[in-house]
Amino acid sequence: MWLDERLLALFRRNFQSTLTYWSVFFSFGLCIAFLGPTLLDLRCQTHSSLQDITWVFFAQQFCLLVGSTLGGVFKRTVKQSLFLLFLSSLTISVVFVIIPFCDHVGVLALVMAIAGLAMGCIDTISNMQLVKIYQQDSAIFLQVLHFFVGFGALLSPLIADPFLSDTNCIQSNATQNGSRNLEHIRNSLVPHHPRNVSHYVLPLQGALVTQVSYAFWIMAAINLPVPVAVFYLIYKKGMVPGCHIQNGGLLSADELAMEMHKENDSQKIEAHEEHGHAVSLLCCQNKKIWNAPFTFFAIHMCAAVTLFMTDGIVGEYSGFVYSYAVEQPLNLAHKTAGYLPSLFWAFITLGRLISIPVSYKMAPRSMLFINLIGVTATFLFLLLSQNSTTGMFVGTALLGLWLSSVFPSMLAYTEDILNYKGCATTVLVTGAGMGEMVLQILVGSVMQTQGSYSFLVCGICLSSLAFTLYAVLLVVDSLHNRASEDSACKPPGLDGEATSYQS
């Protein structure tokens, strides 16, 4: 048996909840990946310039960060979390329906901002609830969760592709000239970096010819079962006002033993709190959080900044690898270079699939160590083989594999240090989102001023910083464990300052 009986029993016990959280993350993946391929058609729909339409990316990403923080506010009860997940997943379907009717770039940006809020809530709550359900076994289920977001992100462009315009979707006298560079412009569009395409001029007035609306409506239909599944979970848990479900099923022997084990653990935790050693609940006790040891804050900071770097690498590499490949020293054809971002995301999804069985056998901290070493080594390989087309494709695939499981592994590891209270999830999700947005701007500006060769140099610097911060996190983890052991050995009341933040 691939999974042990205890884990299978736990999964069966929480099957519906787990499957619902996975499906919601599929919805998140659909929404996060559709904007890039459809942006030129949306430019035509809103009759806006390339510089204006790229700021729709910013509206989505910024509100995703806000939504991630907002999602952390609703973590106190399962009922609050599920109702917010229902509203968020339903919002995404509504957004897909509304987008074809947005004929002004400001209205489109507002709609995408609302979608970003919904996506941020989904990101935080889904991760957090799985951590709360599975605790020390959460790593494998987090890997599956992030596979679903990758699967949704792969499916979204495939749905959109048949409906994208092969020629300029605004018919005018300049259409023929603009259409020659259309595929190159589509691949060069990067969020938050409008200067990347500022030298291209496309017509703003003329007859609109686009069928991209059908792509959005198809994605809305595909996503619609997700809010239905969330609502059904709310109903099954008896959280719908006026509807109370009686669960009269008997537990199996394994499930009964597991429930008894949970009750015993809860009693131990409560007894531990009575003696003033519930450090893991500090994040929920705002009045006492500032009395926590420095290691508590250092763990959050090191983990969040590491993800700031790694998710930033994902964003900047997928955004600029095409622009790097079509210039010196590679000078790839536009069509050939266009495969690189797709290859990168395909191997991220494949890596997340591979990480599911690996995470069952390997601890998250070990996976992180191997992944971060692999990312740095791959950038060195890319730099050494910068004149090789084969090396570029191999390096891109390897980079996607190494980066694929960093976030779920870091989340599982950090929550393990902090005893699985879901406290770090909001901080880590926000840090990762900020990295993806900020580092795209930073790397894009460096490439603009220093040339395309700086693309790989930035990658080496960022990956080295990420590994260094992870090494610091390992040291802080050791110090935190030592401090916790020392605190547990002291009788309550001997050290007033130590117990003030724990009581």
Curated annotation (Swiss-Prot):
Membrane topology category: Multi-pass membrane protein
Family annotation (Gene3D superfamilies): MFS general substrate transporter like domains
TM region(s), chain numbering: 19-39, 53-73, 82-102, 105-125, 139-159, 214-234, 289-309, 338-358, 366-386, 392-412, 427-447, 455-475
Keyword Disulfide bond belongs to the record: no
Superkingdom of origin organism: Eukaryota
Similarity-based family: Belongs to the major facilitator superfamily.
The protein's name in its UniProt record: Major facilitator superfamily domain-containing protein 4A
Record gene name: mfsd4a
